[in-house]
Protein backbone atom coordinates (compact mmCIF):
# COMPACT_ATOMS: atom_id res chain seq x y z
CA UNK A 1 0.00 0.00 0.00
CA UNK A 2 2.96 2.32 0.53
CA UNK A 3 3.76 1.88 -3.17
CA UNK A 4 0.25 2.97 -4.14
CA UNK A 5 -0.03 5.72 -1.54
CA UNK A 6 3.17 7.59 -2.35
CA UNK A 7 2.56 7.14 -6.07
CA UNK A 8 -0.91 8.63 -5.78
CA UNK A 9 0.27 11.60 -3.73
CA UNK A 10 2.96 12.28 -6.34
CA UNK A 11 0.83 12.10 -9.48
CA UNK A 12 -2.64 13.28 -8.47
CA UNK A 13 -1.51 16.95 -8.40
CA UNK A 14 -0.01 16.48 -11.87
CA UNK A 15 -3.35 15.19 -13.14
CA UNK A 16 -5.24 18.10 -11.60
CA UNK A 17 -2.91 20.65 -13.16
CA UNK A 18 -2.17 19.11 -16.55
CA UNK A 19 -5.49 17.42 -17.32
CA UNK A 20 -8.08 19.46 -15.46
CA UNK A 21 -6.16 22.65 -16.16
CA UNK A 22 -6.22 24.07 -12.63
CA UNK A 23 -3.53 25.87 -10.64
CA UNK A 24 -0.89 24.42 -8.36
CA UNK A 25 -2.90 25.72 -5.41
CA UNK A 26 -5.96 23.78 -6.51
CA UNK A 27 -3.81 20.69 -6.99
CA UNK A 28 -2.65 20.99 -3.40
CA UNK A 29 -6.21 21.47 -2.19
CA UNK A 30 -7.22 18.27 -3.97
CA UNK A 31 -4.90 16.05 -1.93
CA UNK A 32 -5.47 17.90 1.35
CA UNK A 33 -8.53 15.75 2.28
CA UNK A 34 -6.37 12.65 1.83
CA UNK A 35 -3.85 13.88 4.38
CA UNK A 36 -6.53 15.06 6.80
CA UNK A 37 -8.36 11.75 6.49
CA UNK A 38 -5.10 9.90 7.07
CA UNK A 39 -4.29 11.76 10.28
CA UNK A 40 -7.84 11.60 11.65
CA UNK A 41 -8.26 7.91 10.87
CA UNK A 42 -4.88 7.11 12.44
CA UNK A 43 -6.01 8.62 15.73
CA UNK A 44 -9.32 6.76 15.60
CA UNK A 45 -7.65 3.55 14.45
CA UNK A 46 -5.35 3.41 17.46
CA UNK A 47 -8.41 3.48 19.70
CA UNK A 48 -10.26 0.84 17.69
CA UNK A 49 -7.48 -1.73 17.68
CA UNK A 50 -8.27 -2.99 21.18
CA UNK A 51 -11.99 -3.37 20.45
CA UNK A 52 -12.04 -4.43 16.80
CA UNK A 53 -8.69 -6.17 16.54
CA UNK A 54 -5.78 -5.20 14.35
CA UNK A 55 -6.52 -7.75 11.63
CA UNK A 56 -10.14 -6.67 11.09
CA UNK A 57 -9.10 -3.04 11.19
CA UNK A 58 -6.37 -3.75 8.65
CA UNK A 59 -8.87 -5.42 6.32
CA UNK A 60 -11.33 -2.53 6.66
CA UNK A 61 -8.66 0.11 6.11
CA UNK A 62 -7.01 -1.63 3.18
CA UNK A 63 -10.40 -2.31 1.56
CA UNK A 64 -11.23 1.39 1.79
CA UNK A 65 -7.87 2.26 0.27
CA UNK A 66 -8.23 -0.25 -2.56
CA UNK A 67 -11.75 1.02 -3.28
CA UNK A 68 -10.49 4.59 -3.50
CA UNK A 69 -7.59 3.50 -5.70
CA UNK A 70 -10.00 1.67 -8.02
CA UNK A 71 -12.27 4.71 -8.28
CA UNK A 72 -9.23 6.80 -9.24
CA UNK A 73 -8.78 4.59 -12.30
CA UNK A 74 -12.21 5.76 -13.51
CA UNK A 75 -11.44 9.48 -13.59
CA UNK A 76 -10.77 11.29 -16.85
CA UNK A 77 -10.50 14.74 -18.43
CA UNK A 78 -14.17 15.45 -17.67
CA UNK A 79 -14.02 14.39 -14.02
CA UNK A 80 -14.65 16.98 -11.34
CA UNK A 81 -12.17 18.05 -8.72
CA UNK A 82 -14.74 17.37 -5.98
CA UNK A 83 -15.08 13.77 -7.17
CA UNK A 84 -11.33 13.30 -6.94
CA UNK A 85 -11.30 14.77 -3.44
CA UNK A 86 -13.89 12.20 -2.35
CA UNK A 87 -11.84 9.35 -3.80
CA UNK A 88 -8.56 10.47 -2.25
CA UNK A 89 -10.30 10.95 1.10
CA UNK A 90 -11.26 7.27 1.00
CA UNK A 91 -7.64 6.40 0.32
CA UNK A 92 -6.41 8.60 3.16
CA UNK A 93 -8.88 7.15 5.66
CA UNK A 94 -7.96 3.65 4.52
CA UNK A 95 -4.27 4.30 5.09
CA UNK A 96 -4.98 5.90 8.46
CA UNK A 97 -6.84 2.81 9.65
CA UNK A 98 -4.48 0.23 8.19
CA UNK A 99 -1.08 1.62 9.19
CA UNK A 100 -1.65 1.25 12.98
CA UNK A 101 -2.96 -2.27 12.42
CA UNK A 102 0.13 -3.22 10.40
CA UNK A 103 2.32 -1.81 13.16
CA UNK A 104 0.54 -3.87 15.81
CA UNK A 105 0.61 -6.96 13.60
CA UNK A 106 4.40 -6.72 13.44
CA UNK A 107 4.88 -5.90 17.11
CA UNK A 108 2.74 -8.80 18.32
CA UNK A 109 4.84 -11.34 16.42
CA UNK A 110 8.24 -10.45 17.89
CA UNK A 111 9.73 -10.59 21.35
CA UNK A 112 9.77 -7.43 23.43
CA UNK A 113 13.51 -6.90 23.00
CA UNK A 114 13.07 -6.87 19.21
CA UNK A 115 10.23 -4.34 19.08
CA UNK A 116 12.47 -1.44 18.05
CA UNK A 117 14.12 -3.39 15.27
CA UNK A 118 10.81 -4.71 13.93
CA UNK A 119 9.19 -1.27 13.98
CA UNK A 120 12.16 0.33 12.23
CA UNK A 121 12.18 -2.39 9.60
CA UNK A 122 8.48 -1.82 8.93
CA UNK A 123 9.00 1.92 8.48
CA UNK A 124 12.02 1.33 6.26
CA UNK A 125 10.12 -1.16 4.10
CA UNK A 126 7.25 1.28 3.67
CA UNK A 127 9.62 4.07 2.65
CA UNK A 128 11.47 1.84 0.22
CA UNK A 129 8.20 0.64 -1.26
CA UNK A 130 7.05 4.22 -1.72
CA UNK A 131 10.32 5.23 -3.36
CA UNK A 132 10.26 2.24 -5.69
CA UNK A 133 6.61 2.83 -6.51
CA UNK A 134 7.14 6.47 -7.45
CA UNK A 135 10.12 5.51 -9.62
CA UNK A 136 8.26 2.76 -11.48
CA UNK A 137 5.14 4.87 -11.94
CA UNK A 138 7.20 7.83 -13.11
CA UNK A 139 8.97 5.71 -15.70
CA UNK A 140 5.68 4.22 -16.90
CA UNK A 141 4.16 7.70 -17.13
CA UNK A 142 7.05 9.08 -19.19
CA UNK A 143 7.04 6.15 -21.62
CA UNK A 144 3.26 6.17 -22.09
CA UNK A 145 3.13 9.96 -22.45
CA UNK A 146 5.88 10.01 -25.08
CA UNK A 147 4.07 7.26 -26.99
CA UNK A 148 0.74 9.11 -26.79
CA UNK A 149 2.28 12.38 -27.97
CA UNK A 150 3.93 10.66 -30.94
CA UNK A 151 0.68 8.91 -31.87
CA UNK A 152 -1.10 12.27 -31.81
CA UNK A 153 1.49 13.89 -34.06
CA UNK A 154 2.91 15.99 -31.22
CA UNK A 155 6.52 16.47 -30.20
CA UNK A 156 7.60 13.80 -27.67
CA UNK A 157 10.03 16.35 -26.24
CA UNK A 158 7.03 17.95 -24.56
CA UNK A 159 7.33 15.23 -21.92
CA UNK A 160 10.12 17.12 -20.15
CA UNK A 161 8.22 20.40 -20.18
CA UNK A 162 5.04 18.76 -18.89
CA UNK A 163 6.59 16.63 -16.15
CA UNK A 164 9.30 19.05 -15.03
CA UNK A 165 8.27 22.62 -15.86
CA UNK A 166 10.54 25.55 -15.05
CA UNK A 167 9.63 27.46 -11.88
CA UNK A 168 7.25 30.31 -12.61
CA UNK A 169 6.67 29.18 -16.20
CA UNK A 170 3.17 28.03 -17.08
CA UNK A 171 3.07 25.36 -19.76
CA UNK A 172 0.22 25.85 -22.23
CA UNK A 173 -1.61 22.55 -22.57
CA UNK A 174 -4.01 22.05 -25.48
CA UNK A 175 -6.70 19.40 -25.79
CA UNK A 176 -4.46 16.85 -27.50
CA UNK A 177 -1.80 17.10 -24.83
CA UNK A 178 -4.39 16.87 -22.06
CA UNK A 179 -5.82 13.68 -23.52
CA UNK A 180 -2.32 12.22 -23.87
CA UNK A 181 -1.53 13.13 -20.28
CA UNK A 182 -4.85 11.76 -19.01
CA UNK A 183 -4.18 8.42 -20.67
CA UNK A 184 -0.63 8.27 -19.31
CA UNK A 185 -1.62 9.10 -15.74
CA UNK A 186 -4.47 6.58 -16.00
CA UNK A 187 -1.79 3.90 -16.37
CA UNK A 188 -0.20 5.18 -13.15
CA UNK A 189 -3.52 4.90 -11.32
CA UNK A 190 -3.99 1.36 -12.63
CA UNK A 191 -0.55 0.39 -11.32
CA UNK A 192 -1.43 1.94 -7.95
CA UNK A 193 -4.69 0.01 -7.81
CA UNK A 194 -3.06 -3.31 -8.69
CA UNK A 195 -0.35 -2.86 -6.06
CA UNK A 196 -2.99 -1.89 -3.48
CA UNK A 197 -5.01 -5.00 -4.37
CA UNK A 198 -1.95 -7.17 -3.72
CA UNK A 199 -1.64 -5.41 -0.38
CA UNK A 200 -5.22 -6.33 0.48
CA UNK A 201 -4.52 -9.98 -0.29
CA UNK A 202 -1.42 -9.86 1.92
CA UNK A 203 -3.47 -8.56 4.86
CA UNK A 204 -5.31 -11.88 5.06
CA UNK A 205 -1.99 -13.63 5.67
CA UNK A 206 -0.96 -11.46 8.62
CA UNK A 207 -0.65 -13.18 12.03
CA UNK A 208 -3.88 -13.17 14.00
CA UNK A 209 -2.45 -12.66 17.48
CA UNK A 210 -4.15 -9.71 19.18
CA UNK A 211 -2.76 -7.38 21.83
CA UNK A 212 -4.60 -9.05 24.71
CA UNK A 213 -3.21 -12.45 23.77
CA UNK A 214 0.28 -10.99 23.51
CA UNK A 215 -0.04 -9.43 26.96
CA UNK A 216 -1.09 -12.74 28.50
CA UNK A 217 1.90 -14.50 26.93
CA UNK A 218 4.27 -11.85 28.25
CA UNK A 219 2.86 -12.16 31.77
CA UNK A 220 3.14 -15.95 31.73
Model-derived segments and spans:
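12-transmembrane solute porter fold
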Residues: 1-148, 187-199, 203-208, 213
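A membrane-interface helix-boundary motif in multi-pass transporters
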Residues: 143-193
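Intrinsic disorder in cytosolic terminal tails and internal cytosolic loops
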Residues: 169, 173, 206-220
Amino acid sequence: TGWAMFGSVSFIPLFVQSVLGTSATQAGITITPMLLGWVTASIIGMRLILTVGHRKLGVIGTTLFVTGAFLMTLIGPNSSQIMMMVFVTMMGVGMGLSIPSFLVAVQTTVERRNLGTATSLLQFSRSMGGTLGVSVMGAALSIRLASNLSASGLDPKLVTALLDPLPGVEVVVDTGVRLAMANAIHLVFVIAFVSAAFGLVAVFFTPHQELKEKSLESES
